[in-house]
Amino acid sequence: MRGATHAKWVACAVTVALAASACGDDGDSGGSGDGAGIVRSSWGDPQSPVEPANTNEVQGGKVLDMIFRGLVRYDPETGEAQNMIAEDFETTDSQKFTVTLKDGWTFSNGEKVTAESFVDAWNYGAHIDNNQKNAPFFSNIKGYEDVHPASGEAKAETMSGLVVKDDLSFTVELTDKFSLWPDTLGYQAFSPLPQAFFDDHDAWLSKPVGNGPYTIESYTKGSEMKLRAWDGYEGPDKAQNGGVDLKVYTDNNTAYTDLIAGNLDLVDDVPAQQLRNVESDLGDRYINQPALIIQTLVFPMYDEKWSADGMEKVRRGLSMAINRDVITKEIFQETRTPAVDWTSPALGEKGGYKDICGDACKFDPDEAKKLIEEGGGLPGGKVTISSNVDTGSHRVWMDAVCNSINNALGGGTCTVNPIGTFADFRNQIGAEKFTGPFRAGWQADYPLIQNFLQPLYYTGASSNDGKFSSKEFDDLVDKANQETDPGTAIESFQQAEEILAEQMPAIPLWYQNGSAGYSENLSDVSLNQFSVPVYDQIKVN
């Protein structure tokens, strides 16, 4: 998915524009010793209003993860797919599945969670008229092409592969065999929706109603979102606190300063500038652990200047002009690891992690120059790197990457294009505004190698922002998805990855650890494998 997120009077003076979120008494953690206080956490405004099939970035995903529960949920420690609302998945051929639900689940408005709640939600998410970003996640369900054709109008209102049997069961027919399909259903696009969503969509978007451990109390764009524990939640992961106030910051250094000042309880992205001091500042309240996150630079393959024949040499050459070892050591203080493929070491070798990029991900200025010259040179003789700079210390590494490229290829070759906010950055990506490589931080939707490859590089995929297209790559992904043996499937996915190494539609930069820091007000703070705080388990002291 789609990214990454003192005296009191001093902090207030610094953050006067954020006074409502950083300095007011409203939202005080107010712990009473029973863990039921409010957690004050840093956050960034999502690109769009949060809804399951239309949110594919990290900030909105954090909210969905608190207010929804789906068929499957990933264990916060291991990433293992575990049934949540699903009682069972039955199949004899890995293509036709019968899904049985547990009884007793409800939405926070009192509506029951039924088979229809899932089928209606998935049909809505898939239909072309609804313009949902995550529609391609439903593309392997039979009938998808009728509700979401490659061109023209829909031929049907619903997918033929989805059939409600009764309140607690429905059947799913896929277009091809996909043995791991149930394991993908922990992604938030597959969440159920109440009838209220369809009765008054605008009202629902203004205050989403879900079936998770939290409800949304209020949201002020640019300031904060208040979520409160739902007393009626009967799931196994009931909130251990009274709620979470997600406070908007456009600079994570400011968030860190507020944490140290006692005006904030949790930051889930420690800025690079603070890494040298974070252990002395926070001690054992600093978390640094591997996560299912990779940072890349995506080429705008929609621009023929970058996608023309021979330009793969230029793209590979730029990759070899980046000194990942120095950047990760000097800037990120061991919270990043130089990338050697397009997945994550958190998958492990059994999960498909392997050095596939090879020499193309190693710093070699001479070879970089040679390849770029052989490929016809950089378009216009220069390259501009774009990224949002409101979170994640992005401006610091952008400058470092450009300095590396300039040192390797000659001064003035590389410049940076900092974008003020994540929302604006994503909007410009969607409008295909960039004429040079742009940052893509991918946080896996589920812990499978497939999720690092298909959503990002498959033709027409939901997060294929650079519009890369390769029939050979697509065919290998299709082949992998149809394998019933996981080991054989992984081999096919790795063969598809080799196409990425040849074509370099995106430069792998580094794997990102999950990092967080928290105040003395909190306990039981942890990050899941996706580097997102396990908010429902946090206690306020």
Predicted region positions:
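N-terminal lobe/hinge region of extracytoplasmic solute-binding protein
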Residues: S42-D93, K207-V209
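Surface-exposed binding/hinge segments that line
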Residues: E90, T100, S117, A126-P194
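Extracytoplasmic/peripheral linker and loop segments enriched in polar/acidic and small residues
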Residues: E90, V163, T328, G411-N427, ...
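Gly/Pro-rich hinge or "lid" segments in bacterial periplasmic/extracellular proteins
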Residues: E173-A239, G243
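Ligand-site clamp/hinge motif
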Residues: D199-D202, D231-N277, L292
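Structural transition elements
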Residues: T337-E374, D390-V396
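Ligand/substrate-recognition segments at binding pockets and active sites
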Residues: L347, L371-A444, P486
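Long beta-strand-rich cores associated with HINT superfamily self-processing modules
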Residues: A516-N541
